[in-house]
From Swiss-Prot:
It comes from Thermosynechococcus vestitus (strain NIES-2133 / IAM M-273 / BP-1). Residues 40-84 are lumenal. Its cofactor is heme b. GO terms for molecular function: electron transfer activity; heme binding; iron ion binding. Gene3D superfamilies: Photosystem II cytochrome b559, alpha subunit. The gene is psbE. GO terms for cellular component: photosystem II reaction center; plasma membrane-derived thylakoid membrane. Coiled coil: none annotated. Belongs to the PsbE/PsbF family. This is Cytochrome b559 subunit alpha. InterPro entries: PSII_cyt_b559_asu, PSII_cyt_b559_asu_sf, PSII_cyt_b559_CS, PSII_cyt_b559_N, PSII_cytb559_asu_lum. The lineage of its organism: Bacteria, Bacillati, Cyanobacteriota, Cyanophyceae, Acaryochloridales. Keywords: Electron transport, Heme, Iron, Membrane, Metal-binding, Photosynthesis, Photosystem II, Thylakoid, Transmembrane, Transmembrane helix, Transport.
Amino acid sequence: MAGTTGERPFSDIITSVRYWVIHSITIPALFIAGWLFVSTGLAYDVFGTPRPDSYYAQEQRSIPLVTDRFEAKQQVETFLEQLK
């Protein structure tokens, strides 16, 4: 036999005016806070990830791509030398 936990049913919660008054403010506020966190660049500083313009050195603006599988080791060594 099923008992009751004493909690309000979910259908009562989402149909209440109080729920929508609270959430009509908090949901957009969280969205705006997240947007500001990312758009101001604070997310890069907090998590320590490089900004999009600093992934590569100034001289190298392309992805270091290995094109020949038989000379892969030589190409990787060349890429690493360019970083120094």
